[in-house]
Amino acid sequence: MALRIRIPQSRSRHSLLFQLAVVALVCGAFATIALALTGGYYYLRYRGVVDARLQQPLFATTAKIYAAPREVRPGQHLLLAQVVRELRTAGYTDPSAATPSPLGTFASTDTSVDVHPGPQSYHSQDGALIRFSAGIVSSITDDHGQPLSSYELEPLLITGLSEDTSRTKRRLITYGEIPPNLVQAVLAIEDRRFFEHDGVNFTRLFSAALRDITTGRKAEGGSTLTMQLARGFFLTPEKRFKRKIIEIVITFQLEHRFTKQQIFEMYANEINLGQRGSFSIDGFGEAAQVYFGKDVRQLNLAECALLAGMIQRPNYFSPYRHPDRAMERRNVVLDAMVETGAVTKETAEATKLEPLHVSRESVDASDAPYFVDLVRDQLTQKLGDHDFNREGLRIYTSLDPDLQAAATAAVVQSLPIIDKQVDQRAARLHHSGPITYPQVALVALNPHTGQVLALVGGRSYGLSQLNHAVASRPTGSIFKPIVYASAFNTSLAGTLLPGYDSLFTPLTQLSDEQTTYEVNGQEYKPRNFEGEYHGEVTARFALMRSLNNATISLASLVGFDTVASLARDLGIASARATPAVAIGAYDATPLDMAGVYTAFANGGLKIDPWMVASVRTPSGDVITDYTPTSKQILDPRVAYLSTSMMEAVLQGKGTGAGVRNMGFTAPAAGKTGTEHDAWFAGYTTNLLCIVWVGNDDYTDIKIEGAHAAAPIWADFMKQAVALPQYSDTAEFTPPDGVQLEQIDSTTNLPADSTCSSDTYTAAFLNGTVPQATCSHPNADHRNFLQKIFGIGNKKPSQ
């Protein structure tokens, strides 16, 4: 019988447990070793990444682009609050601040603002006392009490110009400049144990991981401020487990290299807090200016809580787009601050009653992406390989933030109306397939300085970065004033046009009949836009109604080569001596055409448009200053005669008269343009604006300039003349050698006392006014000069 040995069951169980424990320990050891090796591998691998990153400045000293300074003048309609807001936005602080701004300081009362530029100001350190009364600047005096005729405020920052072409706005701040309430608000809502943990809050991290598992999706949560900083500086925003490990590794390295205060300072400058136009708002310093129009040191409790609350989802909690959400989130932060003991419950409840008090949202200087692109290009041309980013240069430009806002608003408001016209036309033609909607460009400048004040290069920078303001297109009928200026030049020289017995004037009769020309062996038969022909018309009427055939007829009399030569002198390099040159068949950019029209608006002196005024080091040393280039192209008398003719375009039956119906009433001159594209060029005594509307594929827009470009121009100019700096428009003043005459509308002859009251004003070179009048049309038609020299016929031209 076999011997059976029975092992006690308890002993067997203990042995099994022992074996399992050994296996567990071995596995744990291996896991620990593997984890240590993995951690060591990642630590060593990413230490190099961190080292490389930290060898560079954490925040690159990018070049900063500034707008033009606002000029304040006695008698100007301007509120004290506007000046205060602009000084704060520019970075000026109260002189009693713990750390006054190096840009400058200011102090205000109910009736005055005392401005003192600092060592880093754009201007010299000469201060000014600006006094106000009833919404008007009553006086400006310097530091010695002497009166000033004007004073320029500190230019506003547009953007930082980074090497990777990213569009961010950031104002670097130090930890000492951050209000304690802002620090406590951020800690209360984002990382309450920030000053206690070593970079990773494992309790929150595991809770977030468990939440991911139970919900089946990867959500944010569990990250400390240091982890957020690690992610922002070194990693992409993708949500993967491996990235989280790397994030933790980098977090430990940051914690060991920097103090908590340094980490918070970096976080405060790095965190994204929304979007303004095409620019990202990064850091509390910039956010304080954007949302509240003040320096970060001046933020109150409610403002601190709002900014802290926006960290989680800045666009979702935007006080502009979602004010209710923003207020609710702000109040959540205030409750969190009560929980941490940062504020009392009574203080929090009182603060909750405050409205949002954010600055007016507008498309301001920060929304000039096409302008900024051109500035970047100009800097590259001017400075070559100069590393303006590394040196953190300051680039001062020509941009007027108020006017840029008006330009953008005019485009945004007008495009839907233009698109509707396109849709209606497509419906009438039963068009099938995709519809092409037109692009747009707007250029506004000071006609006396060439300063580009506003520029819009397209309907949406986000959709297309192609800058139509510098894209060449056929100029269409806005070219025609060059033809008439060429004709006035012949009068100035005392030269008769072929077949005429009197010098050219606005009353000269032109043939508006369809005519065939031969160009390079081929027939060219131009037609008027509406297919209507008027027979004999005055030159004034031909330009006022934009008659193609009459204008080409005049160009043929002057000489196509003469017209093309003047066009090239004015800046249209492509112009050639063909009949089509007279109606704008050759290309130029909207920016080019703005330069062309300065000659008409500036007494014949053409000024090249410019955008970069000065490039300086961070300490204020000048690297280069821009000097405008100009050339006298037209005689002042010819410039005025052309302007007077273009004033008529905006009156009565002129093609641009619609701008008056749209509410623009200031004295102005202009010209519509309709070829394949729609144009409008116009100016007052202090502002010139060109608008272009057309298709990228060069197809015919099929909308007149009066219905596509003119409404944008009118909308923009109405806003512009309402601004203090452009409100002082005046009538155009004739120079010496030009006289104004009342002309009878029926006979187109000088009016006398027996004529009807239906008259208009026309400008003439001295001595060229016809001697015949409305009541004596058969009188000697020769002008004064012709009578003296015995030339010409006594009968009027037919």
Positions of predicted regions on the chain:
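Short, low-complexity, Pro/Ser/Thr/Gly-rich segments in the mature regions of secreted, periplasmic
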Residues: 781-798
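Juxtamembrane regions of bacterial inner-membrane/periplasmic proteins
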Residues: 2-420, 428-433, 452-453, 458, ...
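Conserved catalytic neighborhood of penicillin-recognizing serine enzymes
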Residues: 211-239, 294-297, 361-367, 493-563, ...
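A penicillin-recognizing enzyme superfamily signal
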Residues: 397-434, 439-446, 455-456, 460-468, ...
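Conserved structural-core and active-site-/substrate-pathway-adjacent residues in large, well-folded domains
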Residues: 87, 186, 229, 263, ...
